Amino acid sequence: MQVWLKKHWASGMVILVLTVSALLFYQHKIRTEDLVDETKIGVSLTPLSAPFFVADQMGLFKQYGLNVSLLPCSSGVSCADLMLSSDVDYATASESVVMFKSFQRDDILLLASFVESDNDLKLLSLVPSKISRVAQLEGKRVGVIKGSASEFYFDSVLIGSNLRDLRVEKVYLQPKELVPALLAYNVDAISAWEPMGFQVDLLSVARVHNLGIEGVYQLSFNLISRPSHLEFAGDEPTRLLQALQDAIDWIKAHPDQTMTLLSQRLEVPVEQIDWSWDDYVFRLSLGNSLLSNLQLQARWAIDSGLVSKSPPDFRRVFYSHPYQQMLAERN
């Protein structure tokens, strides 16, 4: 009897030890998963940021072992400022923001462009102002956002129209002031990006003229970070780009579902998303066209007196290893 009890007691102890060990292992596994470093990304609240919203919604970041938090910001400038102050690890920003920030400091790295548009900016006037051609802006007031894609686009339209020396008054406004200023006829035209074009068309009683030139300016939205983060990030940026590429593939296959998702995330009507959707080209890239665009805008900024330094070497701003690694792993 004692032998039988000892055997069963020993068996029970083995089972207990195995059970406790399994429980401890499971708890350790959960704890380890919880300790995966959080990756914070400042994302501009615009349809241009669609790959990030899709990757988040579809769980694509998690598929690549990333614990990503998207922090919304009102513009590429504010996203970049969050990144430069170390409040986020990555940010989305236009090439204009990258260009201006690179004049100010040398700790910005560009990993890839994820969307382009040659029709996102527009030069708008209202029919009652009797301005239907760029030349009719002579002596008029044009609302622009100083030192931004808005101002660069307006100057590019003047040059493209062979009217570089046109006498026109630039009225510098904040983004939120542009549409109200045009609707109140405080300015005769505005150089604005979407969704401001949609808002003018929606809110204006009068018909709207687009005086701009499609294709004169190529907008890109880009993923940027800091050397101090990337130095210790390992393959995190590569996995981040892989998730974004999967999101872009999904966007191309499901445009209507993407617009519905964006409408919900941005809390805007689907019609607003659809307004400029066909102008967006979603793709990951990091090449000479973006480099040339940065160099062109840098020369414009110097000639316009917006910066006083000589232009930075934008080749040093490109951080191409994660992008090249992502391509290699997909081939």
Task: Give the location of each predicted region.
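Short, glycine-/small- and polar/acidic-enriched structural segments
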Residues: 6-11, 25, 29-164, 169-172, ...
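Hydrophobic membrane-insertion alpha-helices, especially the h-region
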Residues: 12-24
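Ligand-binding clefts/hinges and TM-proximal coupling segments of bilobed small-molecule sensing domains
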Residues: 22-25, 146-167, 242-275, 313-316
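Extracytoplasmic/secreted envelope proteins and their assembly/folding machinery
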Residues: 49-52, 80, 95, 120, ...
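Short, solvent-exposed loop/beta-turn-alpha elements that line the ligand-binding surface or hinge
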Residues: 63, 213-216, 283-290
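Pocket-lining segment of extracytoplasmic ligand-binding domains
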Residues: 170-171, 176-264
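Secondary-structure end/capping motifs
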Residues: 231-308
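Conserved C-terminal helix/tail region of periplasmic/extracytoplasmic solute-binding proteins
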Residues: 302-331
